Amino acid sequence: MLFFLKFESGFAAYNQTGGDGGKACGAYQFDYRYALLPFVKYAYETNPLVCKEFEPYAKYKSGAKLYNNTDFFKAWHQVYKRNSRTFSEMQDTFARINYYDNVERKLQSAGIDVASRSEAVKGAIFSYSIQHGQTSAVNAVKAIKPKSTTSDAKFLKKLYNYRKKSFPLYASRYTQEYKAALAELNQ
């Protein structure tokens, strides 16, 4: 399901800081304007021992102070170094809860069952939601009008074609990500 992460954060993945010009951190590129501060609070509350360097940042009222904050980036690396597995799992859980689970529920309410789809399809939807938001992901899946009889391969093709049409600036990424999704599907 997480085949798309290399397109989000590259090889640094969970330890990545300062992505998108100092705006984002982690495997999912949590952006200071949206999810970075909520993630920091979640991580610190979930495991204050592993994430002890996050204590001062978890008190922030606004994520704006995290923008291009090299002291915060050092804290991020320290947390990762202390327990990379736990910190990575926190990122996965936070992202899934905030960017995938709600999309799946909204699609189910609209009569589109993606819970029974392959991990490749779920990953493609997850990727869409991470990059463009939950509402955009839900609307994209609705727009391609998948039926229960639509194969996962066809679902992926339609979704990535829709994504390229909607966001042509990223067409090259989506072409590569589509290939990765098919590889995941065919495993």
Language model feature labels by segment:
Residues 1-115, 120-187:
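Cell-wall polysaccharide-cleaving catalytic domain and substrate-binding groove, primarily
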